[in-house]
Structure formats: C-alpha cells, structure tokens
C-alpha cells in the first residue's frame, strides 16, 4: 500500500542517514568475507552484507549470484552418520581467492550505514571507486533551498508526498502560484498544480533525477513528466545524472576524505547543475506546455473496449516497468468506474489513488510516470491502444 512520509519525517530520516553514512574505498585484497558469507570486514569495520551489496560483490568477481546465494543458504550431508554441513564456507573460500587475486579494478567503494554503539555496519552497496556518493540529504537540501528562492514568485512550496529509505528517496513538491485549469477535462474545475519530482538512489541502481510534477487537485493524484526540458537557447538540460565522478582517494579506516579539493569541486558542479535545472523546470511556460498536452488528451478518441485498451497498454510495458494481472485489474476498474474513455481518462486511472493504494510508494511513482507517458502519446499511438482491431 502506498504510504507517504511528511516533510518533517522524511527530512529527519535523510539527516539520520547522512549522519550514519560510512563510505570506504579499499583494495579488494583488504576485504575479508566471513565463512557464512553474511558479513564483510573492511579495515576496522565489520558489517552485514545486504542482499544488494552481496549481489554486487558476486558480480564483480564473476561469480553467478543465484549460485552463490544457493551455496550460502543450503547444506549437504556427508559421512555414515549423515552429518549436515553448510555449503557457505566452500563458496566463501572461492570468493576470498578472487578478492585476493582480482582480475578487474582492484579498488572498490563500500557504502555502509553505521548505527554506532558497537553495532555492526550494514553494507548496502559494493561499487566502483568512481561512484559519486551524492547523499539524499544533500540533494533534498539543495532542492528546498531553490524552492525557497522562488517563493516570492510562486508562493511557498507545498509538500505533495515523499518517501525515503537507506537506498533511495522520492519527493514531490508543488507551488500554489503555478496553477492552471484543464479546460477540456470531463471533470468540472479540473485544476492542476505544477512543481518538482526529485529522485535519488544511493546504491548504484540509478541516478539523481529532477522532473516536472503535476498534481490534479480534483482527485489529489499526480504525474511525473518525462518531457525533455531545454534552456532558452533550446539546448537539452540535464534532468538526471549517473553517480560518477573522479577516482576517490583511498582511506580504508576513516572513509572518504571530503576535504579533497577536486572532489569538493565536482560535488559543487553537481549542485550547480541541479539549481540550473530547477530554475528552468519552474518556468510557467513549462506548465502551459503540459496543459496543452492534457487538453489534447481530454479531447482524444474514445476507447472502444476498455479492457482491451488496458491489456494493450500492459503489452507495451513488458520491457520497461511491466504490469501484473492484479495491477491491470486495478487500472481497468478505475478506468471503467470513472466513465472517461479518453486518453486523459486512462492516464487518470493509472495514477489514481484507488490504484496507488494497492502499490508501495516506489511502484506508485512508476505508475505516475506511466500515466504521463500515456497522456503524452501522439494521436496515432493512442489510436492503436483505443481502437478495436
């Protein structure tokens, strides 16, 4: 079920994660895996390997992840008395050998969370030493500062929703001064608010992202825009960026040294990029362009068979986010009950509260992105979904 955090709750969690973050760059031959394959020692720090970090480590030393997991979690019997033994030590010995004699880049960045008080670290990621560790706290602080800077133009930013864990963060913000009506919508007084969608991933599964976010006030749902944003000269702006930077300095015991001038400059460059992108995303003409898209979708061809339309949509998502049978049913039920058979109606069903309640927050956010992709489909592509063959 989709459950969002308040601004205060998310900010507190982001602060705690940054305070407890432990980033260590170490040579592979200084890493020691335990015989049960569940902990890893780096310098003076002993930590539990999360499933994600364990998989990243296995892939780096070219050990099949599924095979390593089976060895770690299974046993075998031996001898006349059928004594039981864990397979983990055998696999751990093989991995230890690859760590001691690496065939790839021998330097890795270990990203951990150190709870303190003598408790073990949680190793959450095993990454290249060129990975740029931009913490969610830093990204959020920059975004909120930028929002405060435009308060005199668009009003005080409003918190639409957000969520965070030790791996990723999602934030959706809107401005009361960026409101417009979708005049062709079947819903009377269908007003939207424009703002920002912010996403960050800290464990190598993605990149930071800044997109436009639109909230529909009639039903309090929203969409994440995938529109290409350009500057005044028409050049595409950076709205997402991989976490890659200069090679990080080795500091096995005390972690990455943030005083390094080159790295500090690289971090500031990222912040400047974020600030510039936000400034362009919040221009009123960006909202006007989206309103034109929504009005066109509201006036589009009607679906001749709602169930077939949803099924065809699900087919198109197979190579991206996919849609389970359960999710298709949620979307169809809302599409049917709303009575709006247009392109606009399907997009609203996809990102509706009724659908979101059946999903976790990250999955609901994917559906908000899908909803925008549907509402922005060219007429010919929409017709392939809407019109019966």
Model regions: which residues?
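Long, C-terminal folded domains that constitute the functional core of proteins
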Residues: 126, 168-169, 314
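Amphipathic alpha-helical segments
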Residues: 129-154
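Extended low-polarity, hydrophobic cluster-rich segments
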Residues: 104-105, 138, 173
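Conserved aromatic-histidine-acidic binding/catalytic patches
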Residues: 45, 123-135, 161
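Extended non-catalytic scaffold regions that mediate assembly and binding
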Residues: 76-95, 99, 110-116
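A short, surface-exposed helix-loop junction/capping segment
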Residues: 99-130
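Beta-rich nucleic-acid/ligand-interaction surfaces
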Residues: 152-178
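Intrinsically disordered, low-complexity regions enriched in serine/threonine
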Residues: 1-90, 161-162, 174-389
């Amino acid at each position: 079920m989709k459950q969002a955090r308040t601004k205060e709750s998310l900010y507190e969690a982001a602060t705690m994660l940054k305070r407890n973050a432990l980033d260590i760059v170490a040579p592979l031959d200084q890493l020691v895996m335990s015989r049960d394959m569940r902990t890893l020692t780096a310098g003076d720090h002993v930590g539990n390997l999360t499933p994600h970090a364990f998989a990243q480590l296995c892939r780096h030393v070219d050990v099949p992840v599924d095979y390593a997991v089976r060895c770690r979690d299974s046993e075998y019997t031996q001898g006349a008395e059928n004594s039981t033994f864990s397979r983990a030590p055998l696999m751990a010995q093989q991995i230890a050998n690859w760590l001691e004699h690496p065939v790839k880049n021998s330097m890795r960045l270990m990203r951990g969370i150190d709870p303190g008080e003598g408790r073990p670290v949680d190793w959450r990621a095993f990454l290249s030493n060129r990975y740029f560790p931009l913490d969610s706290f830093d990204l959020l602080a920059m975004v909120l500062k930028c929002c405060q800077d435009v308060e005199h133009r668009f009003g005080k930013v409003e918190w639409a929703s957000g969520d965070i864990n030790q791996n990723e963060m999602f934030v959706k913000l809107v401005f009361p001064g960026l409101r417009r009506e979708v005049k062709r919508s079947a819903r009377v007084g269908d007003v939207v608010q424009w703002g920002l969608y912010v996403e960050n991933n800290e464990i190598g599964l993605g990149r930071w992202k800044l997109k436009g976010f639109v909230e529909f006030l009639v039903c309090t749902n929203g969409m994440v825009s995938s529109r290409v944003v350009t500057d005044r000269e028409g050049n595409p702006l950076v709205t997402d960026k991989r976490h890659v930077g200069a090679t990080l300095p080795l500091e096995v015991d005390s972690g990455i040294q943030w005083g390094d001038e080159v790295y500090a400059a690289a971090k500031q460059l990222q912040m400047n990029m974020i600030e510039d992108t936000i400034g362009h995303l919040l221009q009123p003409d960006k909202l006007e362009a989206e309103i034109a898209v929504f009005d066109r979708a509201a006036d589009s061809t009607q679906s001749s068979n709602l169930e077939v339309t949803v099924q065809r949509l699900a087919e198109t998502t197979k190579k991206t986010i996919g849609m389970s049978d359960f999710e298709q049913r949620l979307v169809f039920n809302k599409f049917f009950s709303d009575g709006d058979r247009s392109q606009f109606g399907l997009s609203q069903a996809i990102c509706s509260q009724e659908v979101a309640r059946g999903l976790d927050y990250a999955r609901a956010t994917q559906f908000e992105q899908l909803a925008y992709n549907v509402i922005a489909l060219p007429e010919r592509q929409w017709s392939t979904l809407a019109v019966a063959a």
